[in-house]
Amino acid sequence: MPSMELSVISPCSSANLGPGYDVLAIAFDAFYDQVNVMLSDKLRILADEIPVQPDKNTAGLTALKMIEDFGIKDGIKISIKKGIPYGLGLGSSGSSAAAAAYAINNLFALGLERKDLIKYAAVGELASSGSPHPDNVSASILGGLVIVSPEGISAKRIEVSDQFKFLLVIADLKIRDKTKYARSLVPSGVSMGDHKRNTSRVASLIAGLMSGDRELVSTGMNDDIVEAAREPIFPYYRRVKDTAIESGAVGAVVSGAGPSILVVYDNKTETKQMIRKISRIYEGMGISVNFATPNVADGVREVANPLAD
């Protein structure tokens, strides 16, 4: 007999990290989604500001796939409280899908391990981006820095050195169907030279984040393929990146499909000066901007305070 009700929270995330398109992501504690699941007469979604039809909602699609695969006969009511800003490149859709997969697994005692939940949450991303990419959902499920394998949809958590700090530059810039559009700009093929450069950068970035090597991370946080293709959407990006580096930051990349930017910095960075100069860039373009300085987060977890209807 399944439990009657439970609630979980799932962290935001930044994907790609420059050269690691659909391969790298990192979970942060800046924002969380909370998802409540309980038995009901049918599958129902309750949420504000996002689609509530199960087949158009990331949590709903995740639930539909799990219901199908495990022959779940009970109805499920899924209530979603969006703590993660939607459409800003912070893994909002993936967080809801991750939370739904984790909650349904626990509600019905399905016995799945965290790594097994990734494929179900990735299915949910179809509702947002049109493709089941597992990078954000892997970070929200496992926490930490994740390396994703598209084959078989699996991921591995890697611990990040405490030498580094993180700044999220969050522009209040909404673009309709942004993730689908941003993914449509990605080239279908690349030259061998670009492939070798990005492979080297991904290796440098992972090794540097693990070991605390500033130079490796700085080298790794660059990309001439996906970010270059998407640059017209975010005309401020290069100026923000250059300003961050001039202020002593380790590096800067577009967070996921943007418009948010992730800056990695350390004790050599003139942080206040950097934030002040970056703010001026956005002010000059008439764009509102906010900043967050998150810690690396653990993955989705159950909480004791269910959402009120």
Curated annotation (Swiss-Prot):
Question: Under the cellular component aspect of Gene Ontology, which terms does the record hold?
Answer: cytoplasm
Pathway in which the depicted protein is active? Amino-acid biosynthesis; L-threonine biosynthesis; L-threonine from L-aspartate: step 4/5
Q: Cross-referenced InterPro entries, in alphabetical order?
A: GHMP_kinase_C_dom (IPR013750), GHMP_kinase_C_sf (IPR036554), GHMP_kinase_N_dom (IPR006204), GHMP_knse_ATP-bd_CS (IPR006203), Homoserine_kinase (IPR000870), Ribosomal_Su5_D2-typ_SF (IPR020568), Ribsml_uS5_D2-typ_fold_subgr (IPR014721)
Cite the binding residues for ATP.
Answer: P85, Y86, G87, L88, G89, L90, G91, S92, S93, G94, S95
Superkingdom assignment: Archaea
Provide the alphabetized UniProt keywords.
Answer: Amino-acid biosynthesis, ATP-binding, Cytoplasm, Kinase, Nucleotide-binding, Threonine biosynthesis, Transferase
- Under Enzyme Commission nomenclature, its number is 2.7.1.39
* First-level EC class: transferase
Gene Ontology biological process terms, A to Z: threonine biosynthetic process
List locations, semicolon-separated.
Answer: Cytoplasm
Annotated GO molecular function terms are: ATP binding; homoserine kinase activity
Q: Name one Pfam family in it.
A: GHMP_kinases_N
- Reaction catalysed? L-homoserine + ATP = O-phospho-L-homoserine + ADP + H(+)
Protein's job: Catalyzes the ATP-dependent phosphorylation of L-homoserine to L-homoserine phosphate.
**NCBIfam families assigned to the protein according to its UniProt record, in alphabetical order:** PRK01212.1-4 (NF002288), thrB (TIGR00191)
> In which family does this protein belong, per the annotation?
Belongs to the GHMP kinase family. Homoserine kinase subfamily.
Task: Kindly provide the name given to this protein in its UniProt entry.
Answer: Homoserine kinase
Which organism does this record belong to?
Thermoplasma volcanium (strain ATCC 51530 / DSM 4299 / JCM 9571 / NBRC 15438 / GSS1)
Q: Encoded by which gene? A: thrB
